[in-house]
Design a protein with these regions (language model features):
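Jelly-roll (double-stranded beta-helix
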Residues: 1-296
Length: 296
């Protein structure tokens, strides 16, 4: 459900995540939405879990391609093994950041660990895509991992914050990004937190608990997009967990199809052909399976 908030002082729109199925598990997808395609350069938000899976039933995302974007994986629970076509092999655990820039093309997989296959386990996290500026859409693919302990934390207002990527509240993440952004993990006690106001577009996604904005309460699964230039103040319930995102708008419209993002429609068609014809480099160490090109 998408609801306009034209009568609100600071809220532009609220997007309620739609349920989708990915790798046989339910996720909530907030972006893209029919009424809101992006927030700054953030073009995709999937929230998976919290969920438990039994032995033999794991959360495996098979090898698949990307172009024109950076994928950002961040966990609250569980563990995932990342592999890609440039040879990266990296476990990601709660609080870590995996930042993969697809550029002109990369394939990757994200799978449960061997122990989870045997014993079962839990999983909870976010998968986010950040569109690349036009001049950087065709850069060589890269991958970077930032352990939890390397990401800066601070206390601001009534919230404990971690700056995952970009810059916020006077603190910068070590992650290298392609445009001015902020991506912040906020744990808000009863009290308030003001959003950074130095970016063109800003939003707050409720992971757990609830927050109040302009006298209205929003539960988990809601993405609250704020009006540009307006003060955004969140008031939290006990143990509210919120992710803050924002940045400058992309330099022109973006076209999205499946896992591909580009400023040019013909580039999407090229990527489709290349994946269908097996021209993407294979995921190193995970060459036997792949996600086929969808029919539509």
């Amino acid at each position: 459900m998408v609801e306009s908030e034209s009568s609100s002082a600071s809220i532009e729109i609220v997007v309620e995540g739609r349920k989708r199925e990915v790798a046989e598990f339910a996720v909530r997808r907030s972006l893209p939405s029919i009424h809101r395609r992006s927030v700054g350069p953030f073009v995709f938000i999937d929230h998976f879990g919290p969920m438990a899976f039994p032995p033999g039933k794991t959360m495996d995302v098979l090898p698949h391609p990307h172009i024109g974007l950076s994928t950002v994986t961040y966990l609250f629970e569980g563990e995932i093994i990342h592999r890609d076509s440039i040879g990266s092999l990296q476990p990601i655990r709660p609080g870590d950041l995996n930042w993969m820039t697809a550029g002109r093309g990369i394939a990757h997989s994200e799978r449960s660990t061997d122990e989870q296959h045997i014993k079962g386990g839990r999983s909870h996290g976010l998968q986010i895509w950040v569109g690349l500026p036009t001049a950087k859409e065709e850069v060589a693919p890269t991958f970077a991992h930032h352990p939890n302990a390397t990401l800066p934390t601070l206390r601001h207002g009534d919230a404990d914050l971690k700056v995952i990527a970009g810059e916020a509240y006077g603190v910068s993440s070590p992650a290298i990004v392609s445009s001015p952004i902020f991506y912040v993990d906020a744990r808000l006690e009863k009290g308030s937190l003001e959003l950074p106001n130095d970016h063109e577009e800003r939003a707050a996604y409720v992971v757990e608990g609830s927050i109040t904005v302009d006298g209205r309460t929003f539960d988990a699964g809601n993405l609250i997009v704020f009006r540009s230039g307006k003060q955004g103040i969140l008031r939290g319930s006990a143990n509210a967990h919120v992710m803050l995102i924002g940045g400058e708008r992309l330099d022109g419209p973006r076209y999205m199809w499946w896992n591909f993002v580009s400023s040019r429609k013909e580039r999407l068609e090229q990527a489709k052909r290349e994946w269908k014809e097996g021209l993407f480099a294979k995921v190193v160490g995970d060459e036997r399976e792949f996600v086929p090109l969808p029919d539509h």
